[in-house]
Amino acid sequence: MRPLTPRQAEILELIKRNIADTGMPPTRAEIATRLGFKSANAAEEHLKALAKKGCIEIMPGTSRGIRLPAEEEVVVEYGLPLIGQVAAGEPILAQEHVEQYYQVDPSMFHPTADFLLRVKGDSMKNIGILEGDLLAVHKVQQARNGQVVVARVDDDVTVKRFEKKGNLVYLYAENEDYSPIKVDLSCQSLTIEGLAVGVIRNGDWL
């Protein structure tokens, strides 16, 4: 399935909510007003893009001629955000960090995935996590020794194998070219953002 841009995902969610609340889809003018477009024509262009991706069906000749495919109510719930550059001090799932949404069933991973993170570098290549991959992440705040985590160390986000010994945390790469990252919790900040639960190989997904 093709990914949605954040704006497309926002419009799709608006359509879904409007149908749930009123029993009918919004008009183009209503979409434009609620999302700050300058005209209904701008909303129409986004609707055409959603239709091309199979997310909605457009019925000509009526102002409310928007329909969700029969399976779409399920698929919408399966949109996983792809997290891009993370700003210092901001929650990892803040809307401004979301590059786009991928329509993938989060339950295909165990535990269920909450977001995707694009892998940078080759520090985890020995366990099949390669640069450019999309790493599926289950959001948690604590980890057990030996688990592969997404961790934030003093606002730098990294993917490593976790090990805690007293007040020290070691983040191990799966590549002999990289030394462990040592974190002293008495004077450094470390946040567990989630557990790695799977990989989508870049290029195979789109």
Swiss-Prot record:
InterPro entries found in the cross-reference section: LexA (IPR006200), LexA-like (IPR039418), LexA/Signal_pep-like_sf (IPR036286), LexA_DNA-bd_dom (IPR006199), LexA_repressor (IPR050077), Peptidase_S24_LexA (IPR006197), Peptidase_S24_S26A/B/C (IPR015927), WH-like_DNA-bd_sf (IPR036388)
Keyword tRNA processing: no
DNA-binding segment(s): 28-48
Protein name: LexA repressor
Protein family: Belongs to the peptidase S24 family.
Key words, A-Z: Autocatalytic cleavage, DNA damage, DNA repair, DNA replication, DNA-binding, Hydrolase, Repressor, SOS response, Transcription, Transcription regulation
One BP annotation, GO: DNA repair
Entry-linked Pfam families: LexA_DNA_bind, Peptidase_S24
Superkingdom of the organism of origin: Bacteria
Role description: Represses a number of genes involved in the response to DNA damage (SOS response), including recA and lexA. In the presence of single-stranded DNA, RecA interacts with LexA causing an autocatalytic cleavage which disrupts the DNA-binding part of LexA, leading to derepression of the SOS regulon and eventually DNA repair.
Subunit organization: Homodimer.
EC number of the protein: 3.4.21.88
Catalysed transformations (reactions): Hydrolysis of Ala-|-Gly bond in repressor LexA
Site, Cleavage: residue positions: 88-89
HAMAP family: LexA
Catalytic residue positions: 123 (for autocatalytic cleavage activity), 160 (for autocatalytic cleavage activity)
PANTHER family with a match to the protein in the record: LEXA REPRESSOR, LEXA REPRESSOR-RELATED
Gene Ontology molecular-function annotations: DNA binding; serine-type endopeptidase activity
